[in-house]
UniProtKB/Swiss-Prot annotation:
Belongs to the GHMP kinase family. IspE subfamily. This is 4-diphosphocytidyl-2-C-methyl-D-erythritol kinase. The lineage of its organism: Bacteria, Bacillati, Bacillota, Clostridia, Eubacteriales. Gene3D superfamilies: 3.30.230.10, GHMP kinase, C-terminal domain. The gene is ispE. Coiled coil: none annotated.
């Protein structure tokens, strides 16, 4: 059984506090984009969970979130059968686009159908939260306000068909490390989430592009100054606004039209030769 597992960007990311377990309390606007991995799962003749992937640098053992999802799903519903999971990877790894989380989300949804468990999306999201804070959102997808550590999800009016160029530099970033180095007391200006939501409801891409904000840039851009150059190059190439997604290092920019986006894409691809560059669009939701 096959399914597309879509990437996400953060249109806003704010940290407003910290829990006793050191997880940050967040307010984020998440958005699905039309860049996806393909997850294919079939039952196996034994009780093993095996993972294969078209990219050699993706771990295929218990470190992979898709593997963790399969283990948790089997434990939760007392399933003995094994599964073979194939991941066709297109979403960049360690990029701040929820590549691992969206794979885990797809595994839960597929196994729910494959084994005729018929668990509700809410139950799947509860299992997903044990894997990672982005997994519940990845199960739901679309345009959403995510709060708590990311598990409190309020769907928003779809902000679809917005053109963006996405650039993932040729290095990864540790999400854990970024959050460890984030000092909430040093955040001078918090994100105007309500203003952004209002603008998105009014389909005001210009306001959104100029006012989107990610407080994790304070950490990641300090360590990787090339990201500032990428943002500046995107703006010079005609972007309405550019920002880092999640903990980074991926940077994305919104564009008014496809021609400008195409030119920016060509320029960025030429300048940042060892980076992954994509043109994509925001989409309404997953096809879960």
């Amino acid at each position: 059984m096959k399914m597309k597992a879509y990437a996400k960007i953060n249109i806003a990311l704010d940290a407003i506090g910290k829990r006793e377990d050191n997880y940050h309390l967040l307010r984020m606007i998440m958005q699905t984009v039309d860049l996806y991995d393909v997850i294919d799962i079939e039952k196996s003749n034994d009780s093993n969970i095996s993972i294969s992937c078209n990219k050699h640098y993706v771990s295929t053992d218990e470190r992979n979130l898709a593997y963790k999802a399969a283990v948790l799903f089997r434990d939760e519903f007392n399933i003995k059968d094994g599964v073979k999971i194939n991941i066709k990877k297109n979403i960049p790894v360690a990029a701040g686009m929820a590549g691992g989380s969206t794979n885990a989300a797809a595994v839960l949804v597929i196994m729910n159908k494959l084994f005729n468990v018929n668990a509700s999306l809410e139950v799947l999201k509860e299992i997903g939260l044990k894997i990672g804070a982005d997994v519940p959102y990845c199960i739901e997808g679309g345009t959403a306000l995510c709060e708590g550590i990311g598990e409190i999800i309020t769907p928003l009016k779809p902000f679809e068909n917005k053109i963006l160029v996405v650039l993932k530099p040729n290095f990864g970033v540790s999400t854990k490390e970024v959050y460890t180095n984030l000092d909430i007391n040093k955040i001078r200006k918090h994100v105007n989430i309500e203003g952004l939501i209002q603008a998105m409801e009014n389909d005001d891409l210009d306001y959104v592009s100029k006012n989107m904000k990610n407080v994790l840039e304070n950490v990641t851009l300090k360590k990787h100054t090339i990201l500032k150059n990428i943002k500046e190059d995107m703006r010079k190439s005609g972007a309405l606004g550019a920002m880092m997604s999640g903990s980074g290092p991926t940077v994305f920019a919104f564009f008014d039209d496809m021609l400008t986006a195409q030119r920016a894409f060509e320029f960025l691809k030429g300048k940042y030769k060892y980076s992954d560059v994509y043109i994509t669009r925001t989409i309404n939701s997953n096809n879960l």
